[in-house]
Curated annotation (Swiss-Prot):
UniProt region (Disordered), positions on chain: 286-308
UniProt keyword terms in alphabetical order: ATP-binding, Cytoplasm, Ligase, Nucleotide-binding, Pantothenate biosynthesis
Pathway annotation: Cofactor biosynthesis; (R)-pantothenate biosynthesis; (R)-pantothenate from (R)-pantoate and beta-alanine: step 1/1
Transmembrane domains' residue ranges: none
Name this polypeptide is given: Pantothenate synthetase
EC number: 6.3.2.1
Binding site for ATP: 39-46, 157-160, 186, 194-197
Active-site residues from the entry: H46
Misc. remarks from the entry: The reaction proceeds by a bi uni uni bi ping pong mechanism.
Organismal lineage: Bacteria, Bacillati, Actinomycetota, Actinomycetes, Mycobacteriales
Native organism: Mycobacterium avium (strain 104)
Gene Ontology cellular component list: cytosol
Entries under PANTHER family matching the protein: CYTIDYLATE KINASE/PANTOATE-BETA-ALANINE LIGASE, PANTOATE--BETA-ALANINE LIGASE
Highest taxon of the lineage: Bacteria
Reactions catalysed, as given in the entry: (R)-pantoate + beta-alanine + ATP = (R)-pantothenate + AMP + diphosphate + H(+)
């Protein structure tokens, strides 16, 4: 039986086959299908992705809500991840989203892990260091969502910058016909990057969490003095808060290769407050002033690991 679809209302599907059929039918009528993948616990950062998707002329927006077990590493509590489906659907309805895809793990992986996506070497760096299977899980589920929905564009936030870069790599390397759109990080009034993890912070931790964005901002302001200066400025801000356990502070190029001596770069940080792990990053323009160490010195410093 053909799945029902009512234009202008939120239609919720749990079956991959139903979403595929509805998406195909909508494309045949000239609608442009936009996909916003999420794991639920929606906040204004997710809604910024939805609004960016809705701005595309002729678009119909599909938001997937799926807590993907493949991207949780050993020691990470899959069951503890926040699940707020009713609230999420209410938010999507208020935003005028027309399709929500809320599959179960059994529906997404009916044959178990028989076939998965193997990421490239970047998967072992930064976020992949302590979580060696994480990006294989991310890329596998995104690849499946792309096959199920067949969107014209797929939207991701720049907060999870390594994820965005790796999805772009997969789309290019596997010749997947979709445009990957990165949306700038949405922040709280004090600069903290919006994240579903922020709800785990107590009041004191919430005040300290802004240190990450403050450190990145300090680094960006110092970037005109070179990459090493940007890292020193950011490190000084982080060092002033002993409650923070910093996993890494690294300067990379836009594709997360070695940091450039000058030009566009990304400063990335991951740190823990109690049991909550926070991520953030910022784009900056590196300059190399006359008389400084030069490109080799900056590059070596920019790739050095964090030392507490």
């Amino acid at each position: 039986m053909k799945p029902a679809f009512t234009a202008g209302e939120l239609n919720t599907y749990t079956s991959p086959g139903d979403v595929t059929a509805v998406s195909r039918a909508l494309r045949h009528t000239g609608r442009r299908v936009m996909l916003v993948p999420t794991m639920g616990a929606l906040h204004d950062g997710h809604l910024a992705l939805v609004r960016a998707a809705k701005r595309v002329p002729g678009s119909v927006v599909v938001v997937s809500i799926f807590v993907n077990p493949l991207q949780f590493s050993a020691g990470e509590d899959l069951d503890a991840y926040p699940r707020t489906l009713d609230d999420d659907l209410a938010l999507l309805r208020s935003e005028g989203v027309e399709i929500a895809f809320t599959p179960t793990a059994a529906a997404m992986y009916p044959n178990g892990l028989r076939t998965t996506v193997q990421p490239g070497p970047l998967a072992a760096e930064l976020e992949g260091g302590p979580r060696p299977t994480h990006f294989a899980g991310v890329l596998t589920v995104v690849c499946k969502l792309l096959q199920i929905v067949r969107p014209d564009r797929i939207f991701f936030g720049e907060k999870d910058y390594q994820q965005l870069v790796m999805i772009r790599q997969m789309v290019a390397d596997l010749n997947i016909d979709v445009q990957v759109v990165g949306v700038p990080t949405v922040r709280e009034a004090d600069g903290l990057a919006m994240s579903s993890r922020n709800r785990y912070l107590d009041a004191t931790q919430r005040e300290l969490a802004v240190t990450l964005s403050a450190a990145l901002t300090a680094g960006a302001h110092a970037a005109h003095l070179g990459g090493a200066a940007a890292l020193r400025a950011a490190r000084a801000v982080l060092d002033a808060v002993p409650e923070l356990t910093v996993d890494y502070l690294e300067l990379r190029d836009a594709g997360l290769g070695p940091a450039p001596a000058h030009g566009s770069a990304r400063l990335l940080v991951a740190a823990r407050l109690g049991n909550t792990r926070l991520l953030d990053n910022i784009e900056m323009q590196i300059e190399t002033p006359a008389g400084t160490a030069g490109p080799d010195g900056d590059r070596q410093y920019a790739q050095s690991p964090w030392r507490n």
